[in-house]
């Protein structure tokens, strides 16, 4: 049984760690009618404080890079970086803790299109384009954590980043699956 002082704690615990992810981006948001359809890979992390026995919030940040091969030269890519404040609800059942939540924040899409040339030389490329587009990020996610020990958890998470800019929904978009480790107290 928890003592009255422990029950009144504002912060019930904290957790944080790193995750790698893989997914798929599709769609096009460019004047060249390039339909981006590519696997994407990345890394990121989170740090959260547990405010109740079932609710936690904090900060997180990730980046994800998708190589583009259709309609452009090798070396072209679409990169997403986003950071924000995650809020999720979790339910601890023995060693397993499923969770559901969303992150609200912002980010930047960087698109690099190489139309002619070679990425392996040191020559200036005349037909290349680099564009950066800031966006508002809303990232719903679901996941599950498994306690390996007292302080170490493995996490598996899936999300679908929705990035909005002044014209509406930013494309490309798509799902991602994360695998990582979380240290918790």
PLM ranges: what are they?
Residues 49-122, 138, 146-152, 182-185:
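Gram-negative (and chloroplast) outer-membrane scaffold detector with strong preference
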Residues 2-51, 55-57, 184-185:
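Short glycine/proline- and aromatic-enriched beta-strand/turn motifs that initiate or cap beta-hairpins
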């Amino acid at each position: 049984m928890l003592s009255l002082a422990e029950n009144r704690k504002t912060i019930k615990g904290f957790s944080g760690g790193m995750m790698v992810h893989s997914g798929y981006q599709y769609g096009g948001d460019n004047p060249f009618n390039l339909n981006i359809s590519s696997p994407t890979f990345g890394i990121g992390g989170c740090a959260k404080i547990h405010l109740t026995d079932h609710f936690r919030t904090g900060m997180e940040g990730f980046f994800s890079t998708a190589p583009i091969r259709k309609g452009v030269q090798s070396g072209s890519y679409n990169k997403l970086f986003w950071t924000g404040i995650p809020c999720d609800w979790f339910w601890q059942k023995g060693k397993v803790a499923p969770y559901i939540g969303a992150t609200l924040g912002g980010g930047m899409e960087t698109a690099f299109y190489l139309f002619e040339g070679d990425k392996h030389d040191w020559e200036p490329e005349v037909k290349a384009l680099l564009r950066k587009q800031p966006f508002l990020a809303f990232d719903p996610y679901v996941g599950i954590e498994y306690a390996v020990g007292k302080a170490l958890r493995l996490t598996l998470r899936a999300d679908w980043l929705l990035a909005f800019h002044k014209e509406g929904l930013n494309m490309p978009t798509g799902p991602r699956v994360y695998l990582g480790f979380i240290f918790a107290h």
